[in-house]
Amino acid sequence: MRVTQGTFCYLPDLTDEQIRKQIQYAINQGWAVSVEYTDDPHPRNSYWEMWGLPLFDVKDPATIMFEVQECRKQFPNHYIKVLAFNSTKGIESTALSFIVNRPANEPGFVLRRIESNDRVQRYQIHSYATEKPEGSRY
């Protein structure tokens, strides 16, 4: 199962040149760019690990691509994404986010039905990846 999170999630994986162009777009908008990674891509897991600090005031996409490559070397079997943060007053939110690396095998998710009181049906998404301990999931 292919994890679909962020911009471009339904397109084929971006090439490094396409990633560089998206980073250049973010820089042109004045957004701060950061790199994050995780081995638990659950849709509600919005707290991925940061790879270094956010890169404020960087004007060259090669600097950010270097950080992406270093993160890929360190975590080749993790999900890695690039985020662009718009710090404009009143917006102050992620403006762009896309996955730039994924494990070769994506185990996917299962939807579990849980019966509750008063015959209420609740549903829970469970990641197969979390059945293994952190650090050995892929």
Swiss-Prot record:
Cited InterPro entries: RuBisCO_ssu, RuBisCO_ssu_dom, RuBisCO_ssu_sf
BP-aspect Gene Ontology terms: reductive pentose-phosphate cycle
Gene3D superfamilies to which the protein is assigned, alphabetical: Ribulose bisphosphate carboxylase, small subunit
Keyword annotations: Calvin cycle, Carbon dioxide fixation, Chloroplast, Photorespiration, Photosynthesis, Plastid
CDD domains: RuBisCO_small
Pfam families: RuBisCO_small
Gene Ontology molecular functions: ribulose-bisphosphate carboxylase activity
Highest taxon in the source lineage: Eukaryota
Localization annotation: Plastid, Chloroplast
GO CC term, one of those recorded: chloroplast
Tagged with keyword Chloroplast: yes
Note: In this alga, in contrast to plants, the small subunit is encoded in the chloroplast.
Family annotation (PANTHER family): RIBULOSE BISPHOSPHATE CARBOXYLASE SMALL CHAIN 1, CHLOROPLASTIC, RIBULOSE BISPHOSPHATE CARBOXYLASE SMALL SUBUNIT
HAMAP family the record matches: RuBisCO_S_bact
Function: RuBisCO catalyzes two reactions: the carboxylation of D-ribulose 1,5-bisphosphate, the primary event in carbon dioxide fixation, as well as the oxidative fragmentation of the pentose substrate in the photorespiration process. Both reactions occur simultaneously and in competition at the same active site. Although the small subunit is not catalytic it is essential for maximal activity.
Quaternary structure (record): Heterohexadecamer of 8 large and 8 small subunits.
Family of the protein in this entry: Belongs to the RuBisCO small chain family.
Entry protein name: Ribulose bisphosphate carboxylase small subunit
Native organism taxonomy: Eukaryota, Rhodophyta, Bangiophyceae, Cyanidiales, Cyanidiaceae
Gene that encodes the chain: rbcS
